[in-house]
From Swiss-Prot:
Pfam families: ABC_tran. This is Uncharacterized ABC transporter ATP-binding protein MJ1508. It comes from the Archaea. Gene3D superfamilies: P-loop containing nucleotide triphosphate hydrolases (3.40.50.300). ATP binds at residues 38-45. One of its GO terms (molecular function) is ATP hydrolysis activity. The keyword ATP-binding applies. GO terms for biological process: transmembrane transport. Residues 2-221 form the ABC transporter domain. The keyword ATP-binding applies. Coiled coil: none annotated. Belongs to the ABC transporter superfamily.
Amino acid sequence: MIEAKNVWKIYGKGEAKTIALKNINLKIEEGEFVMIMGPSGCGKSTLLNILALLDTPTKGEVYYKGRRTSSMSENERAIFRRKISGFIFQQFHLIKTLTALENVELPMMLDERDKSYRRKRAKKLLEMVGLGDRLNHYPHQLSGGQQQRVAIARALANNPKIIFADEPTGNLDSKSGMAVMSILKGLNEKGITIIMVTHEQELTKYASKIIKLRDGEIVEIINK
């Protein structure tokens, strides 16, 4: 489904040059639950962003279903990000002036869905993540765990095939974190591919594949 071949990411030049990723080679199959792990600064988020087409490699290629993503137009890349992918971040990135329902509707507005469809689907998704009684709450009226569940519902708005999650439990207490992981596992069991960055070893029980990074290099790939 997604493949990286000889991917490098280099920032700066000369003495200021920083190598964030070194010769990354990996393959992610449809339906896998992949965890990218390693210490802070090892290149986890950089790799996730490149696989998600939020960033481009300095050298090497990323393929989606056999096609070089470097050959995609900017419009095709935008469609990949908007329709094929869903994104969940550590900081939630909810819009403070919108309700939970409106935050989930937003990707569908960008996709020009009609209002009745948006409202019905957003309500259904929030009910699915256990927030049917929080539809009209604003982010500041929700706990961290509830905000992350809104973010998951938003990520699902356009029926993505892949969810990219960057430390989705990083700002949550253990109970809320486990609730989020349970939701992600359930989505994976329905066929959605999950690619997730984490440094929490105890979460590896949810993964079908673990990619371990150190200093920008893959040091181990574990298929469970």
